[in-house]
Design a protein with these regions (language model features):
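Short basic helix-loop element that most often maps to the first helix and adjoining turn
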Residues: 17-36, 61
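A short, Lys/Arg-rich alpha-helix, primarily the initiator
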Residues: 3-24
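DNA major-groove recognition helix of helix-turn-helix/homeodomain DNA-binding modules
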Residues: 57-72
C-alpha cells in the first residue's frame, strides 16, 4: 500500500511540474491560467506544487486553459514519471 501511495504522490508531483512548465512556456501567470481554465488560482498553485489532487474534470479544465488536449497533458505526465523512475 505504501508503494501505491508513493506512486500517487509522484504522479501528482509530475502533473504539477508538467502544468507549471507548460504555463511558463506560454508566458502565462497562474492568475491568467486560472481565468482561462476556470480553476481557482490558489488551487492551481497547490496542484503545481503537487500538494493537491485534482479531479478528472479539473485536469481537463487546466489542459483546456493550457490549449492542449487532456491526453497530451497525461502523456507528458507519464513521460515525467518514467524519467523520475529511471533516475
Amino acid at each position: 500500500m505504501s508503494n501505491k501511495k508513493h506512486s500517487h504522490q509522484e504522479l501528482y508531483r509530475c502533473l504539477g511540474e508538467v502544468i507549471a512548465i507548460r504555463r511558463k512556456r506560454m508566458g502565462l501567470s497562474q492568475e491568467e491560467l486560472s481565468e482561462a481554465s476556470g480553476v481557482d488560482r490558489s488551487f492551481l498553485s497547490s496542484v503545481e506544487r503537487g500538494k493537491r489532487n485534482p479531479s478528472f474534470g479539473t485536469v481537463a479544465s487546466i489542459a483546456s486553459g493550457l490549449k492542449m488536449r487532456y491526453t497530451k497533458l497525461i502523456s507528458n505526465c507519464e513521460q515525467c514519471l518514467q524519467a523520475k523512475q529511471a533516475s
